[in-house]
Amino acid sequence: MAENLAALDDDEAELRAATLRAGLDDYDLDEEDAALLSGEYGDEGDEGPLKLDPVLAIIGRPNVGKSTLVNRILGRREAVVEDTPGVTRDRVMYSARWNGRNFTLVDTGGWEHDAKGIHARVAEQAEMAVELADAVLFVVDSAVGATATDEGVMKMLRKSKKPVIMVANKVDDFAQEADSATLWGLGFGEPYPVSALHGRGVADLLDHVMDTLPEYSLVDGVERSGGPRRIALIGRPNVGKSSLLNKLAGSERVVVDPLAGTTRDPVDEFIELGDRTWRFVDTAGIRRRQHMAQGADFYASLRTQAALEKAEVAVVLLAVDEVLSEQDVRILQLAIESGRALVLAFNKWDLLDDERRRYLEREIEQDLAHVEWAPRVNISAKTGWHKDRLVPALDIALESWDRRIPTGRLNAFLGELVAAHPHPVRGGKQPRILFGTQASSRPPKFVLFTTGFLDPGYRRFITRRLRETFGFEGTPIEVNMRVREKRGKKR
């Protein structure tokens, strides 16, 4: 079949398709059919060079209301908020807008002086956020007043030499504004009294922020051509997502700890791989039973799904030192249902002996047969072994995800397929495929106009042959039917 299609002239293919399309005029078509058949497909081109929005970092000691303030500024619940110190652990970026201006908002974990263990790593992340920011909101609990930890934050901010706006949070009414005056002693000028929980004073604060921020970021102020392709790293907790992101970025971008579920918010990072910029999203591990998850873990699982929806390609990380679980399969299904391109990354492959590798290959063939079309990369998130193989796999998946088949070629393919493998006769009737068109890409979706319903098995057969013939590797594809009858036919 592939040879016959290759030998077919494009003009001849389009002529055949036009003949088949004309034949549809004898059938009852609705407005949606007509729109689909007459619509012209156009891919979005590159947006050209663009400058990065200015960056505003929010910093303070644990549990002063930083994430609550983030949600208030964004006008929606994005940052994970819980009345427990330390819920935000990484520096997390969000796109924000105020009075017609865009800026990037960075939420950070609580900064603590001389912190130990994971808290020390959280503090380092907060300091890195300050380095990459154009201005900083220093949030202090007005009800508590300045503490020794606040003074430690003050010293760190002074060394950074960044513009700092002092925010006195938890000022719920006018009577409490006097408490904020005591914060003058921290040396950053007049504190802005706000209530992040109720929104009091936040508008005035943002007006001042807009006066402080530059038009474009002066820190990372390079121009990027087009928009970087967006990649979601997903997988069950503690599978190595954060370690992989850090290895790719070449820095400790995400807090890594043996404790499962350390990453709670989606974390975006622009990473240079294969001479191009990619936007990676490292997400919290998807929990086993979302409806049973409590507090921060519940909201983090929702954030993970939201990040997947915003991505273009999902890299599903699977640990080869553990048996493939139902949870792994469910996560894969979630990626497929989202319609994103897909790459499978098998972590810790370098630790396997030959016998275990042979066993795992058989296990993959059995348990992952439904995603045999996805490119596979065997890597080590910890050491970076084979990390260079990710880019070719991502390219293959995204090219397939973007691909569009000319209508003439598609109908020539369908004609060859049906001639060689006609649909089985059911109840004395044999449904025919009248015409086919690709309704969209990202992911590729095809619509077949037919005279009757096609068996599920036959539709799977068409899908499989579409993959083989046109090279749809790394993307889910969808084949839908529109059953139509001839005009004037008695029912």
UniProtKB/Swiss-Prot annotation:
Keywords: GTP-binding, Nucleotide-binding, Repeat, Ribosome biogenesis. Gene3D superfamilies: 3.30.300.20, P-loop containing nucleotide triphosphate hydrolases. PROSITE patterns: G_ENGA. GO terms for biological process: ribosome biogenesis. GTPase that plays an essential role in the late steps of ribosome biogenesis. HAMAP family: GTPase_Der (MF_00195). Associates with the 50S ribosomal subunit. This is GTPase Der. The gene is der.
